[in-house]
Amino acid sequence: MTRKQKRLSVIVGGLAFLGAATGLTFYALGQKASYFYMPADLTTASVQPGQRIRLGGLVEKGTIQRGQGATVAFSVTDTHKSVKVTYTGILPDLFREEQGVITEGSFGPDGVFVADSVLAKHDERYMPKEVADGLKAKGVWQESKSE
């Protein structure tokens, strides 16, 4: 093998390795991706039972029900549509009615969203970006009254 052929084979091998690494990275990221939806978006989205998504909105007033142990049921709304959510675990301290939340999980076969994580807004001025953008797009955004 000449020097030129060796160099060419090293370059081709390096490019093949880089391409394989890039492909595996995108494949792994695609498997872990969870898409964000507001409750009203779910009517037009093709979300399959078991598919991981993030569901965001406001905790609907009067829907928080504490079950046995650490199980909690509540509804997430964007003021147009509501989705029933169940969660087993410790809720954030700031979780309460009419506050912004993002839940991550999947729909069960019964149509109830089974969350494995719940994130609540931090203070009266903070709202998760996805939730705020979704509420603004639906025309139901309310500015903070504490200013």
Curated annotation (Swiss-Prot):
Membrane topology classification: Single-pass type II membrane protein
Chain residues that bind heme: 122, 126
UniProt entry keywords in alphabetical sequence: Cell inner membrane, Cell membrane, Cytochrome c-type biogenesis, Heme, Iron, Membrane, Metal-binding, Signal-anchor, Transmembrane, Transmembrane helix
Bilayer-spanning residue ranges: 8-28
Chief location of this protein within or outside the cell: membrane
GO biological process annotation, one example: cytochrome complex assembly
Name listed for the protein in its UniProt record: Cytochrome c-type biogenesis protein CcmE
Provenance organism: Mesorhizobium japonicum (strain LMG 29417 / CECT 9101 / MAFF 303099)
